[in-house]
Amino acid sequence: MEKFQHILFFIFLLVQSPLVMCTTKSTIPVVKIGSLLWDQTEMTIADVKIFAATIAFISLAEKNGGGLSYEAGFVKKPGWTWKTPYGVIASDQEPAVHLNQKEAELICRHFGKRLPSDEEWTSAAYLEQRDNPPSGYIKLKRYQYPGGDSPRNSQCLSGCGDYKGLAPIGALNRGAGHVAAGTTLPGVNGLLDMGGNVWEWTSTERNGGFITRGASWWYGPERQQESDIESKSGDIAVVYIGFRCVTDALR
């Protein structure tokens, strides 16, 4: 009982603090964009394992026996969790899904980071801010897709890059699932998978939920555009929703 109380107190401290600087180091490389350090990829299973081992974390999807997928309405998929997104053991480099918005924020805080706001997300995803961007990108140009002028850098339902999703054959009624973090080519500002792969939670509230950005493997490239503003209930944990973390750059 005493151990359980200590765990609850630790979680309380994480939630209350605006930004908790922990000694735990993330395995995800970061990219500096303006005044923020961005995780270059979406949150991975590897990093959630680090977090989970520290505080004996059990996600809501795990407690409920599985997360959700969409099949003419949301349905619970037994055994589908952040560790097993399609019901089978996954690679550590796959994006962590089946985590709700509050869980995503808690995980970011464990690494001394946070979820980005919608404004921060769109600025990093569409506005090229590097002083000397590589060929194909122009400083201060606002792009149609997070990958640039086209969605070819992304994993989506169709019309994007030539990538093979990792869902087992027959697991899904639509699409082929996500690819591992770091599989696709860098896009605007050198970030990966801001468009497609999995939706990403933000900290911005809208219509009783939270804005998610970037679309996922479930949709075509049209949903990756900045004008597509989607919000979802903060307590939902779905196979195609993940997240990435940011922190303020040290000056």
Which ranges hold each PLM region?
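Extended beta-strand/loop cores of jelly-roll/beta-sandwich
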Residues: 2-7, 11-119, 124-128, 229-251
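Functional-site microenvironments in short loops/helix caps that host divalent-cation chemistry
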Residues: 76-97, 101-230
